[in-house]
UniProtKB/Swiss-Prot annotation:
WD repeats lie at residues 106-145, 171-210, 215-254, 260-301, 303-343, 395-430. Keywords: mRNA processing, Nucleus, Repeat, WD repeat. It comes from Homo sapiens. The gene is CSTF1. This is Cleavage stimulation factor subunit 1. The keyword Repeat applies. It is found in: Nucleus. PROSITE patterns: WD_REPEATS_1 (PS00678), WD_REPEATS_2 (PS50082), WD_REPEATS_REGION (PS50294). Its main location: nucleus. GO terms for biological process: mRNA 3'-end processing. The N-terminus is blocked. Pfam families: CSTF1_dimer, WD40. One of the multiple factors required for polyadenylation and 3'-end cleavage of mammalian pre-mRNAs. May be responsible for the interaction of CSTF with other factors to form a stable complex on the pre-mRNA. Residues 14-35 are annotated as: Hydrophobic.
Length: 431
C-alpha cells in the first residue's frame, strides 16, 4: 500500500501527541523530560488523542486514521474544552487583557454576587444593601458607545427607555448572597443572609417584591435551577443540601446522611442535561451527585489540599469540573476518573486569599479566569495548557468578590466591595 513520506513536521506532531498523552496519564516528569529534549514550538495540553488514533489504527486501516485526524468535529475550536481530542486547538477567542470596561453600576453597599441569564442578554447583581439590579447587556454596550453630547441631550423619557438598569428589586432585609435566572421564564431567584429564597417576576416593570419565597433555617450561600426550571438546588450555611420543587416548595434531601458535606455549602451547579450536579464546601470537598436520585456519586476529598472550595462548575460537555479554592488555585477535574488534569497557578502569589471568589471559563472555554484578591487583577490561563496570559487590572477600589462570564459572547461582570459592578466587553473591530 502506498504511504506518504513522513516529514519533520509529522514527527513533531507525533512527539506532541506523545507528550500530551503522558500528561493526560499523569506521567508529568517523563513528559517534562521529553519536552526539555525535543523543545516543541507550542505548549502541549493533556490529551488522549493519541490513544484514540492508535485504537482506530488497530481496528481499521490507515485511511480511517487520516479521516479521524481531519474530521471537523474532532477538533472544533470555540465549542468548548475536550482534552480527548483538542490537544492542538488554536485559540480563537480574545484573552482577558483585551476586554475593557463598558459600564459601571453602583449599589449602596458592597456588591458581592452576579449572574447571567442563559441567553446572555441580562445580568443581575446583588448587594449587601439588600437590593438587586437587573441590567440589559445590549443597553450597556449602546450606552458606552454613545457620544457624550448625545447623552447630555437625552430627555428624561429617552434616558429611562435607554437606561441599562431595567429593574431594581427590594424584598430582602439583609445581604443578597446568591442569584439565578430561571432557564425559560422571566423569573429571578435570590438567596440572602435573611434566611430566605425569593422568586421575582421581572416581566412586570412595576414589580419590586417577590411573588413567592421559601423560609430557610440558615443563610443561603448558593442556588442553581434545574434546566427544566421546575426545581432549584439550595446550598446554605448548613451542610445538608436541599432540592426544592418551585411549584409546591416541597423539599427533598438525600436519603443517606453520609452523602452530605460536613460544613457549609459554598457552590451548587447543575450540568446542562441535569443528570448531574456538583457541590463545593467549606469542608474542602467537591461532591458529584446523581441528578435523578439525589445521591452522591463520588467525593473529591481535600480537592484544594484541605482549603475551602469556593466554586465548582461543569464544562459544556459535562466531562470536566472547574473548581477554585482558598488556596488561590483553579483546577480542571476529569469526571470519569476523578483526576486533576490541569492546575492553574500563579494567583495569590502576594498572599493567600481570604475571601471567596470564583474560577470561570470564558464563553468558548478557551480560557480560565480567576481574580487575584491582593492585586485586584484578573488572572487568565489557556484552559488546555495552563499557560499564563496577561493580567487585566480590574479598576476596582476594593477586593473583587465575584466574577461571571457571559455564556454567549466576550463579556463578563465583576463585583466588588467598593460597592460597584463593572461590565467588561471585548469589542470586535466591526463594532
Amino acid at each position: 500500500m502506498y504511504r506518504t513520506k513522513v516529514g519533520l513536521k509529522d514527527r513533531q506532531q507525533l512527539y506532541k501527541l506523545i507528550i500530551s498523552q503522558l500528561l493526560y496519564d499523569g506521567y508529568i516528569s517523563i513528559a517534562n523530560g521529553l519536552i526539555n529534549e525535543i523543545k516543541p514550538q507550542s505548549v502541549c495540553a493533556p490529551s488522549e488523542q493519541l490513544l484514540h488514533l492508535i485504537k482506530l489504527g488497530m481496528e481499521n486501516d490507515d485511511t480511517a486514521v487520516q479521516y479521524a485526524i481531519g474530521r471537523s468535529d474532532t477538533v472544533a475550536p470555540g465549542t468548548g474544552i475536550d482534552l480527548e481530542f483538542d490537544a492542538d486547538v488554536q485559540t480563537m477567542s480574545p484573552e482577558a487583557s483585551e476586554y475593557e470596561t463598558c459600564y459601571v453600576t453602583s449599589h449602596k453597599g458592597p456588591c458581592r454576587v452576579a449572574t447571567y441569564s442563559r441567553d446572555g442578554q441580562l445580568i443581575a447583581t446583588g448587594s449587601a444593601d439588600a437590593s438587586i439590579k437587573i441590567l440589559d447587556t445590549e443597553r450597556m454596550l449602546a450606552k458606552s458607545a454613545m457620544p457624550i453630547e448625545v447623552m447630555m441631550n437625552e430627555t428624561a423619557q429617552q434616558n429611562m427607555e435607554n437606561h441599562p438598569v431595567i429593574r431594581t428589586l427590594y424584598d430582602h432585609v439583609d445581604e443578597v448572597t446568591c442569584l439565578a435566572f430561571h432557564p425559560t421564564e422571566q423569573i429571578l431567584a435570590s438567596g440572602s443572609r435573611d434566611y430566605t429564597l425569593k422568586l421575582f417576576d421581572y416581566s412586570k416593570p412595576s414589580a419590586k417584591r417577590a411573588f413567592k419565597y421559601i423560609q430557610e433555617a440558615e443563610m443561603l450561600r448558593s442556588i442553581s435551577f434545574h434546566p427544566s426550571g421546575d426545581f432549584i438546588l439550595v446550598g446554605t450555611q448548613h451542610p445538608t443540601l436541599r432540592l426544592y420543587d418551585i411549584n409546591t416548595f416541597q423539599c427533598f434531601v438525600s436519603c443517606n446522611p453520609q452523602d452530605q458535606h460536613t460544613d457549609a455549602i459554598c457552590s451548587v451547579n447543575y450540568n446542562s442535561s441535569a443528570n448531574m450536579y456538583v457541590t463545593g464546601s467549606k469542608d474542602g470537598c467537591i461532591k458529584l451527585w446523581d441528578g435523578v436520585s439525589n445521591r452522591c456519586i463520588t467525593t473529591f476529598e481535600k480537592a484544594h489540599d484541605g482549603a475551602e472550595v469556593c466554586s465548582a462548575i461543569f464544562s459544556k460537555n459535562s466531562k470536566y469540573i472547574l473548581s477554585s479554592g482558598k488556596d488561590s488555585v483553579a483546577k480542571l477535574w476529569e469526571i470519569s476518573t476523578g483526576r486533576t488534569l490541569v492546575r492553574y497557578t500563579g494567583a495569590g502569589l502576594s498572599g493567600r486569599q481570604v475571601h471567596r471568589t470564583q474560577a470561570v471559563f470564558n464563553h468558548t472555554e478557551d480560557y480560565v479566569l480567576l481574580p487575584d484578591e491582593r492585586t485586584i487583577s484578573l488572572c487568565c490561563w489557556d484552559s488546555r495548557t495552563a499557560e499564563r496570559r496577561n493580567l487585566l487590572s480590574l479598576g476596582h477600589n476594593n477586593i473583587v468578590r465575584c466574577i461571571v462570564h457571559s455564556p454567549t459572547n466576550p463579556g463578563f461582570m465583576t463585583c466588588s466591595d467598593d460597592f460597584r459592578a463593572r461590565f467588561w466587553y471585548r469589542r470586535s473591530t466591526t463594532d
